[in-house]
């Protein structure tokens, strides 16, 4: 079921992917709560854990995640991306709730943990709750990206940063094709397409139509190569 979930996700078939991700998590003993009261309690504790992580990092020692924790993070990251597209409300509450479970780990040691924490920035920029908190998450994770035993990639981090800048009205350096290339090299067409989408919108707003057209060309190439519904949909919309 886990392989099916990842296959569906890579093809942009998000509703079915989430269904199989949930089944896998249930088999691993990490079933997400459905009771509204439990969800709200997890949300509150998850938010408090995030604040503690961002503003009081010196008061705690990180733990090393075990194999199950790493496997769960490998599931939660793509699941969160899929939920953001099909159910923003569930995406917000589930992602905040999961922070409580993973904030105690040294997220700089594992790419998926690092990407998940970085991606939490979207919870506050996408919803418009707090661009300040969204930026704080980006700065915090970037500052610690070289503090682990091995370097983590900032490619996905730059996708989230691009989204934050677009939503907050901040200017940035524009399209970095190396980000697209790196994401595609690991088969992450979702993040590559999202990055190009945000750049396309920015270039259109600035009147830089030549660069906007370049983004379209990249998206067409991704759609033709990966045949996933998400990049095809984004290309069609643009």
Where are these regions (language model features)?
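Amphipathic helix-loop-helix modules that constitute alpha-helical solenoid scaffolds
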Residues: 7-93, 126, 207, 217, ...
């Amino acid at each position: 079921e886990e392989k099916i979930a990842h296959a569906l996700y890579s093809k942009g078939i998000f509703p079915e992917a989430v269904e199989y991700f949930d089944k896998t998590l249930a088999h691993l003993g990490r079933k997400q709560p459905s009771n509204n009261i439990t969800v709200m309690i997890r949300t509150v504790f998850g938010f408090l854990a995030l604040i503690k992580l961002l503003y009081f990092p010196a008061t705690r020692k990180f733990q090393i995640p075990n194999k199950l924790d790493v496997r769960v993070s490998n599931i939660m990251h793509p699941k969160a991306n899929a939920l953001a597209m099909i159910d923003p409300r569930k995406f917000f509450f589930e992602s905040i709730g999961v922070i409580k479970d993973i904030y105690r780990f040294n997220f700089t040691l594992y790419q998926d943990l690092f990407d998940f924490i970085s991606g939490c920035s979207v919870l506050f920029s996408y919803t418009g709750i707090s661009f300040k908190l969204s930026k704080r998450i980006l700065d915090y994770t970037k500052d610690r990206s070289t503090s682990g035993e091995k370097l983590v990639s900032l490619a996905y981090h730059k996708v989230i940063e691009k989204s934050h800048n677009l939503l907050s009205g901040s200017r940035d350096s524009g399209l970095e094709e190396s980000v697209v290339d790196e994401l595609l090299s690991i088969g992450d067409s979702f993040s590559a397409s999202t990055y190009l989408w945000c750049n396309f919108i920015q270039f259109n707003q600035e009147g830089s139509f030549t660069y906007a057209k370049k983004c379209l060309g990249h998206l067409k190439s991704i759609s033709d190569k990966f045949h996933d519904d998400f990049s095809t949909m984004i290309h069609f919309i643009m």
